Amino acid sequence: MKNASSDLFSVTAYKAIIQNALDNHYVFMTVKEFLDKGSPDKKVFILRHDFDKKPENCDIFINAERELNVRSTTYVRVANNDYNPFSYIVYPKLKKAEKEGFEIGLHSNFVEYSKFTDIPIKEALTSEWKALSAFFNIEGMSCHRDINYSYNSLPWVEENDLFLKKIGIKYQAYDKKILDSVLYVNEGLNPHLCWRNMTPQEAIKTGKSICLLTHNHWWYYDHPFEN
């Protein structure tokens, strides 16, 4: 028998979430646009994607969003073992999206990278930011953590706001200005893939602004093992 929850993370289910929000008069914004508008706490929907792995699937959300004429923010890793953001496969897809109004940002666990490579923390972050900035027009970042992460970069980010501004980072995605104004909805493992705390549909019913965080490697078109 098919698991009743097995279609929760299909592209069809994702498009249904967006359509539900549109039907309930939500306005879609990138993270940058949300901050530029003063972080409104009602009827705004942010689609945030942390691109962790599975490069062949990097635009699975973007393709769905194009169909429904909404825009999102994708945070991209530079220093990692899973993909090259400047590859022949990944870069054209993300650059095309940026030209269409999608936002690209940096996704990084630079503290962990520093610990494992002996590159100073500030140098690691600056180098990642400069590398991605050379290919995309970026303004923000989000901190990355693997399931088995050893070091968390977020505390360092929160304590070094002036340094972030100095190298050109205008915002970080876990800023209180964002989190205090939205219902934060995301998928995760508990122990299997599920929605944490609440589902997108439950959040939409409240009328409050929503930040929906998703990860491309957990989503699929037809079934979870298609790639």
Which ranges hold each PLM region?
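Terminal accessory/targeting
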Residues: M1-R48, D52-G101, V111-N227
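Beta-strand-loop-alpha-helix segment that lines the small-molecule cofactor/substrate pocket
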Residues: E103, H107
